[in-house]
Amino acid sequence: MLNKSFIVGAVSLCGLLGAGLVSQSALAATAAAPDLVAKYDKDSDQTLDLAEVKAAASAHFDKLDKNADGTLDAKEVQGVIGPQTFKAADPDNDGTLSKDEYLALVAKLFNKADTDHDGTLSAQELKSKTAHALKRLID
């Protein structure tokens, strides 16, 4: 009996801890949204358009390109782009992302995060899971 109670308690605790991690991630994305707008909103309209996001992504690409060869390999984007996303973003299958391929991924995520399809990302839209992935590509 004691062992069964212990196991049930441990499983419940793991569930609560897991829920806490999800909540912390959601809170971090929520807190980052206004900062992202403030940092990259060049026309001061309180939203990010695709041009603003691509400009930020282009600069971030250059920072990630440690060997300055104009492409990003899996090692250079470790922690930024997961292996499956990297493979999907590499249509020529050469094992690297050119700036055009990187910006195409950025545009794809931008369009997915733009839930009202107005061509901009509001602070609210920047709280989504997709926008959190987009943030890693621009900041």
Question: Each PLM stretch: what is its role?
Answer:
Residues 10-20:
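Bacterial N-terminal signal peptides
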Residues 41-45, 65-69, 90-94, 114-118, ...:
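Acidic carboxylate motifs that coordinate Ca2+ or other divalent cations, activating on Asp/Glu
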Residues 2-5, 20, 24-63, 74-88, ...:
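EF-hand Ca2+-binding helix-loop-helix modules
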